[in-house]
Amino acid sequence: MKGGRMSTDSRVGTRPLPERPNLRHLKDQAKDLRKSGAASSLADAQFRIARLYGFASWPKLEAHVESLEEIGQLKQAIDANDVARVKTMMTRNPPLHRAPLGYGKDGPLTWVTECRVPWEPPSPARLAMAEWMITHGSDVHQGGDGPLMRAALNGYRIPMMELLVAHGADVNAMWHGHFPIIFAPCESMDAAALEWLLDHGANPNLRDPRQSAASRPYPGTALDYLIASYARSLERLGACIEVLLEAGGETRYDTPPVLAVLRGRLDHLAELTRADPGLVNKRFSELDCGQTGGRLLLLQGGTLLHVAAEYGNVAAGALLLERGADVNARATIDEAGIGGQTAIFHSASQFNDYGLPITRLLLERGADLTVRVKIPGDYERPGEIVECTPLGYALLLGGESQGRTVALLREWGAVE
């Protein structure tokens, strides 16, 4: 093997092919193996190379790599909006309609409808490509309506959604058997795509069928999924909530003051806290949401100020503080001693400094930067519990993407 020795001992197990395997490179590996004396012939060397990558024979490995190369060429044609090339390739080799391409490997049609490369609204060429594929062998339902699920992530793809539904795509389908199509625009917080699905018959209260079987609350309805999602934009969140409520959407987070903060309804929040001043420091144990920024921390046991900090609602935060909310109120601490974070832990650990404005508000109102708590850590390390200050948490999770928030905390004398 060029550049170093390659073990072909079967005892070391197989290795995965490179992401973009090259047949010429594999042939060179076999030749190098033959020259090294580790194989008795070129055929023996090719067999050893095939087995190294988990294939029963060289012809099987060769056929697999050639198919991947052809799939790569098809993707290039799609990305270039080269309708003629796509037609030629798929007509010559119809199985390409089912090639493992696109999100979830659902197929070329899924990749076409997502309009990711180039990132733009579906052009006439892209729409023509999708329609030709559907009428010549591509399954509009591939992967559980994967094409519609990916198109529904963005409102400017509505022309593609219209085409798919016209050809039988189901707005109430379950992508891969468990993810309602309506969850897609909830994840991306796209009110236009969400409203289009609802106007075309999507059920706002459709649930993951595995949820009922397991008797668990997550992910719940579309409104539950929206509120519990990781994306952050107060404007877009509020718009999507309004669309779902108008369509009869239900949520387990149906607590008036919480929804007032999430919807950006300051008038309603002011009315509620005026009628019941104790709301500003009440803790809400039912809030199993608020996970973002690559962290596992939730809002359970937090106050309305924690909610405002988590979702970046500066105006709501200011109103709550003016009404007597404790800027250093701690969330509930469980029997294991986990919890007790103040609102600033939520605002200081958002992606891309999203929480910077409300972090500044909390600091100006006296947020304690020395408080140290034990709380859930990184999303990639389930079960991790970290002991930290607000600055320590921001450094742990935000990295360079939290540069301005970290700098602000340091300006105010924060300690790790």
Per-region residue spans from a language model:
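Intrinsically disordered, low-complexity eukaryotic regions enriched in glycine, serine
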Residues: 2-88, 92, 111
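Ankyrin-repeat-protein effector appendages
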Residues: 66-76, 200, 227-275, 356, ...
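Alpha-solenoid repeat scaffolds
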Residues: 68, 96-97, 103, 115, ...
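Ankyrin-repeat boundary/"N-cap" motif
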Residues: 69-76, 98-118, 141-153, 174-187, ...
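Ankyrin-repeat intra-repeat helix-capping/turn positions
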Residues: 81, 125, 155-156, 189, ...
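Structural detector for tandem alpha-solenoid helical repeats, activating at a conserved register
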Residues: 84, 128, 159, 192, ...
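Ankyrin repeat domain, specifically the short helix-to-loop turn at the C-terminus of the second helix
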Residues: 90-96, 127-139, 162-170, 195-204, ...
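Residues within HEAT/ARM-like alpha-solenoid scaffolds
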Residues: 103-104, 121-128, 155, 159, ...
